[in-house]
Curated annotation (Swiss-Prot):
The lineage of its organism: Eukaryota, Fungi, Dikarya, Ascomycota, Pezizomycotina. CDD domains: GAL4. Residues 29-41, 54-67 have a biased composition (Basic and acidic residues). It comes from Podospora anserina (strain S / ATCC MYA-4624 / DSM 980 / FGSC 10383) (Pleurage anserina). SUPFAM superfamilies: Zn2/Cys6 DNA-binding domain (SSF57701). GO terms for cellular component: nucleus. Residues 1-72, 122-148, 181-211, 325-375, 509-541, 586-622 are annotated as: Disordered. This is Transcription activator of gluconeogenesis PODANS_4_8760.
Length: 682
């Protein structure tokens, strides 16, 4: 009997296997239960499981979890997709080669997602790999795309390479430059999306380095249709984005390209672009009229002082709010000073000079630049950026001694005894005496280094609160635990008329509005500390204003009574009360009768009100016209006899030793109106 592995047995088995696969290849109705591993093992082995070399091949169980798995392809071919078999990334795949279908092996068609219905079919092909061939022709057959097989030369081609891409020449400073080149170079040459790397071999500074002539770019002109599948027009690596589809990778890369080049071209240069397809490179566009150190500052300035970003057209006196800075590179901080905001563009002259900016090599450029003073050299860059650079590290370098809280409490009692009557001063002293034992117990074991560290923490906390007060729209105060003013915002100065320098003790306090105090019958002798303070006040340093000097008598007493309860009580607690703030006035009080005792308030002179408003507007942060309108219908309407009816909410910030360190006060004022019956409402 002939063996099963005879000459006719193996051929019959291969023929039968091939016929069975041919019959089941494009059958959509018959289910396929055989795995691809089983089919390939049947093709390569005899019925006995012996291959042509005589070695026995191990047949893996399809359900065995330890069997080797094939790498999943990103997209199956059309034949493997219909047969529901495992395919590979190569084209043609191994299965189509073994079946003789390598000529018709092509990518299968996937169902479009909803967000890709408007996408062209060319953009839905898989992510480009090393087999990408931009010159490969594509044709349509039966609604499907057919790609030619890429050659071996295309597999070793780099990702950004073109067969017809021109090389960029590099010129050194020693080579000759074509005549008439610099005259045709525009000042604001825009860079092409294709950004090759230029290496400068010259040792000269960059301002007078190499100048490259305009070269032809391989990018397609914008007037002609371009191929979105060509990655060279966007100059980014699509394979490195790890996207599953070519369309998503191109969209993400294009958004990144647009965002990276958004700040390259200023809006002033939108009408002076170059021709498409020409790339102008050159570091010597500015000529030799400027210093090398002036180039970074010169490039960061706005083009003209009268452009759309300038603020010089604002009218004086108008009620302007916090103005937007002059441009993206402006160094001016928002403010509402009396002077009108000026454009922050600074350069070589007060007016824009088109000759200097657009024609740097003109004959008259050198003489004009020499005749004008170089203002840019005199500007200190550190001083300009000082308003924007807030670094709290200087606190730990400058604070070398602790704050004298004992002397500050002595000054507070001097103010209380000189401005307040005896009953009110006694009530405030009683409130402070309630927290005195707790303060002494907390500071008993503290060393000098602890006190210095306590002051550093106070300055660091105040540093943060100053930013909060600047951004807050409500009048805000920051005080020490003794009541000295440590920080204030502009809203509070506009409300009360107290300037920041007076509140912080940088200027003498000349306020004469004492809240309607009367003259004592028995004068009090000045102490030794008061006499020394008056004689050597300037030498003793700044003397900030106490919070008790900003309130009338009843409001100050109520504040210190709340302070005695909140100082060592709830650390998150807050207090809200009504008060009367005193307006800052420097008029000399009229010589009234000296026999009045108690709290009789002085009546202001009606004729002196316009003069006082005019004086207050000079020191106000508002302009003259705004201050005049404000005096008639604004904040000045709220004050009665030099007092403002307000409501304040304050809380205490403690330090690391659980002692009251800083309390912050937010003020809110009321609008009063009279009803039909003459009753006053808030």
């Amino acid at each position: 009997m002939p063996e099963d592995g005879g000459p006719f047995g193996s051929e019959a088995a291969e023929a039968s296997g091939a016929m069975s696969e041919t019959e089941n290849e494009y059958d959509d109705h018959e289910p396929h239960h055989k795995d691809e591993d089983d089919r390939m093992s049947e093709q390569n082995t005899t019925p006995d499981g012996v291959d042509a070399g005589g070695e026995v091949k191990k047949k893996y169980d399809p359900k065995d979890p330890l069997r080797p798995r094939r790498k999943k392809a990103r997209r199956a071919c059309y034949a493997c997709q219909r047969a529901h078999l495992t395919c590979g990334d190569e084209r043609p795949c191994q299965r189509c080669i073994k079946r003789g279908l390598q000529d018709s092996c092509q990518d299968g068609v996937r169902k479009k997602a909803k967000y890709l219905h408007d996408a062209p079919p060319e953009a839905l092909r898989p992510v480009l790999g090393p087999n990408y061939n931009p010159n490969a022709p594509s044709s349509r057959h039966g609604g499907q795309r057919h790609h030619s097989v890429s050659t071996d030369a295309s597999t070793v081609r780099t990702f950004f390479s073109h067969s017809n891409a021109s090389q960029y020449p590099v010129y050194s400073s020693t080579q000759s430059i074509p005549h008439g080149l610099t005259e045709s170079l525009p000042f604001n040459s825009q860079q092409s999306p294709v950004s090759p790397t230029f290496q400068q071999t010259s040792s000269n500074p960059p301002i007078s380095g190499m100048v490259a002539p305009p070269v032809s770019s391989p990018m397609t002109p914008f007037g002609l249709p371009f191929d979105p599948s060509d990655p060279n027009i966007f100059n980014f690596n699509i394979d490195g984005l790890n996207f599953g589809s070519h369309y998503g990778a191109m969209e993400f890369g294009m958004l990144g390209h647009m965002s990276s080049s958004a700040a390259d071209t200023p809006p002033q240069e939108s009408g002076m672009g170059q021709q498409p397809g020409d790339v102008h490179f050159g570091a010597g566009l500015f000529g030799s009229h400027f210093d090398n150190r002036m180039l970074p500052e010169f490039l960061g300035l706005d083009a003209g002082a009268n452009g759309i970003y300038s603020q010089g057209n604002l009218q004086h006196g108008l009620p302007h709010a916090y103005a937007i800075p002059a441009g993206p590179t402006s160094l001016q901080s928002p403010s509402t000073e009396n002077n009108s905001p000026q454009p922050t563009t600074f350069g070589f002259d007060d007016r824009p000079s088109p000759t200097m900016s657009q024609y740097p090599n003109a004959p008259g450029a050198k003489s004009s630049s020499n005749s004008r003073p170089s203002k840019l050299r005199k500007l200190d860059k550190v001083a300009i950026l000082q308003k924007r650079q807030r670094d709290p590290s200087y606190i730990y370098d400058t604070v070398k001694k602790s704050f004298d809280y004992v002397g500050s409490f002595h000054k507070l009692f001097e103010v209380l005894s000189s401005r307040f009557s005896q009953p009110h001063a006694a009530r405030i002293a009683k409130s402070l005496a309630a927290i005195r034992p707790a303060l002494l117990a907390s500071t008993r074991n503290l060393t000098t280094q602890d006190l210095i560290f306590m002051e550093q923490c106070f300055q660091r906390t105040l540093f943060e609160y100053e930013d909060f007060m600047t951004q807050s729209s409500s009048p805000t105060l920051a005080c020490r635990r003794t009541g000295e003013i440590a920080g204030v915002n502009k809203e509070f100065t506009a409300l009360t008329g107290w300037t920041k320098d007076v509140l912080l003790g940088k200027e003498p306090n000349r306020n004469t509005n004492l809240g309607g105090t009367g003259v004592r019958t028995t004068p009090r002798l000045k102490s030794l500390n008061e006499s020394s303070a008056e004689n050597g006040g300037a030498a003793s340093g700044p003397r900030p204003v106490f919070l008790a000097e900003l309130m009338d008598h009843e409001s100050a007493v109520e504040f210190y009574e709340d302070y005695s309860q909140l100082a060592f009580g709830d650390s998150r607690g807050r207090m809200t009360r009504k008060c009367r703030l005193l307006k800052y006035r420097t008029d000399k009080p009229a010589a009234g009768g000296g026999g009045g005792a108690g709290e009789e308030e002085r009546k202001p002179d009606p004729s002196a009100a316009p003069r006082q408003q005019e004086k207050d507007s000079r020191h106000s942060i508002l302009s003259n016209r705004v201050a005049k309108i404000d005096g008639e219908h604004g904040i000045s309407k709220l004050e009665r006899d030099g007092k403002l009816e307000c409501s304040y909410t304050w809380t205490i910030k403690r330090d690391m030793f659980d002692m009251p360190m800083l309390f912050v006060i937010n003020v809110r004022f009321f609008f009063f109106f009279d009803d039909y019956y003459g009753r006053r409402h808030c």
